[in-house]
Amino acid sequence: MEFTPEVRRTTNPIYQKISRFLPEIEWSVHAPYIHKINKLKKEKNALILAHNYQTPEIYHGIADVAADSLALAIEASKTKADLIIMCGVHFMAETAKLMNPNKKVLLPDMGAGCSLASSITAKDVRM
C-alpha cells in the first residue's frame, strides 16, 4: 500500500498521538493500512475493540475502544455495530460473542493466546 498525500492528510491526527512511540519512517508503512481499515470499518459498520497491550498503531490508529478485558466485554454488549473485531486474545473474542450472540465477532490473529488463561486446568478450577 502506498503512503499517498491523502493518506498522510487523513492519518496525520492519529500520528500526532503516537509520534513519540513510532518514528515517521515506520508510520509511512502503517498509515496506509490504518487509512484503509478505518474506511472499511465505516463501510461495514464495524466496531474495533483493542486490549490495552496492543501496539500504538492499533491502540491509537484503528481501535474504537481500547481498554481491559472487562471494559471491552461491556462495550461489546452495548454496540449497535454489525461486526465486532477483537484485537485481543481468544477468551476476549469469546466473551464478546457471548455478550452479543447475534453479532459476527472476528479475531484477526487466531494464534493470539493468553498465557494466564492457558496455565489454568480443570483441576485448578475444582480445587
Regions found by a protein language model. Give the residues of each.
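Active-site loop-to-helix "anion-binding N-cap" substructures in soluble metabolic enzymes
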Residues: E2-M127
